[in-house]
Amino acid sequence: MADDEDDYMSDAFLNQISDVRPGVPMVKRVKEAIKKEALHKEKDIQNRQKSFKEQEKESREAALQSSIGSQNKGFALLQKMGYKAGQGLGKEGAGRVEPVPLNIKTDRGGIGMEEVKKRKADEELQNYRRKVHMKQHLEKKSIEDFRVRKRTEREERQTQGDLRKSQRACEQLDNQKGITVPRDCWYWPEVEKNEESELLEEEIKTEESDEEEELTPLDKLQFLTSYLRGVHYYCIWCGTAYNDEEDLGTNCPGDTAADHDD
C-alpha cells in the first residue's frame, strides 16, 4: 500500500468519526420532550391566571356591591343626621334603597356613539326589509304579468281560430242562399288572387283605410258573428243553423265563446 493512501482502519481515521451509538440520540429526544412538557405546563398556568383588566373589573364590581362601612366619613355624617343603614331616601324613607348603578364605558367610542351605531343598524335593517319587500313585489308582479301575457296569447289564438271558422261558415251559408259576393272582403276566407285582382284590392283597401281605422280580429269576429246569427241563424260554437231567430235565442247559450264554456 502506498504511503500517501489513507488507512481506513487506522486509529487516526476512526477517531474522526462522531459517536453514533443508539443510546445518545434517545437521551437527547427525552430531554427535548421534558422541556416541551415544562413549557406546556407553564403556558397553562399563564392562561389560568387572570389578566390585570379582569382582576380590576372584578375588584370594582365587588366594591360596588358592598355597602359603605361606618368608618367612612361621609356615611358617619349621614348617621349623625339620622340615617340608618338599609333605609330608603326621603323623609318617609320610601325612596331608593339601592345606589344608582355605574355604567363604566370600556370601549374607545366617543360619547353618543352607541346611539349612532344603533340608529345606523336600525336604518340598515329597515333598508334590508324594504329591499326584500320590493323584490317579493317585483317577483309577484312578474309572475302575474307572465300569466296575463299567456292568457292574452291564448285568447288571441282562440279569436283567430273562431274568425277563420266563421269566415268558412259565412261563405258556405251565403253560397247556399245564392249570395255570390261577401258583404265585406274579410267576411269570406282569403283566396289566391291574380296580379290584377291584388292591385284592385290594394286600391280598395287604401280608400277604406282613409275612411275608417283597421279592424282587429276581435272586431271582425263580433261583426261576423252578428251577421251569421242575424242572417243565417247560425252559431259557430254550437255548430248549428237554427230555424229562426226565436229558435236561436231559445237554444243557443249566447253570442261569445265564453257563453259556451259550460
From Swiss-Prot:
Biased composition (Basic and acidic residues): 39-61, 114-127, 136-165
Gene Ontology terms for molecular function: nucleic acid binding
UniProt-listed PROSITE patterns: G_PATCH (PS50174)
Keyword presence, Coiled coil: yes
Coiled-coil stretches noted in the UniProt entry, renumbered to this chain: 41-62
Keywords linked to the UniProt accession: Centromere, Chromosome, Coiled coil, Kinetochore
Domain annotation G-patch: ranges: 70-116
One Gene Ontology cellular component: kinetochore
Domain of life of the source: Eukaryota
Pfam families on file: DUF4187, G-patch
Keyword Coiled coil among UniProt keywords: yes
Localization annotation: Chromosome, Centromere, Kinetochore
Annotated region (Disordered), positions in chain: 39-71, 88-169
Family membership noted in the UniProt record: Belongs to the GPATCH11 family.
Name of the featured protein: G patch domain-containing protein 11
Organism: Danio rerio (Zebrafish)
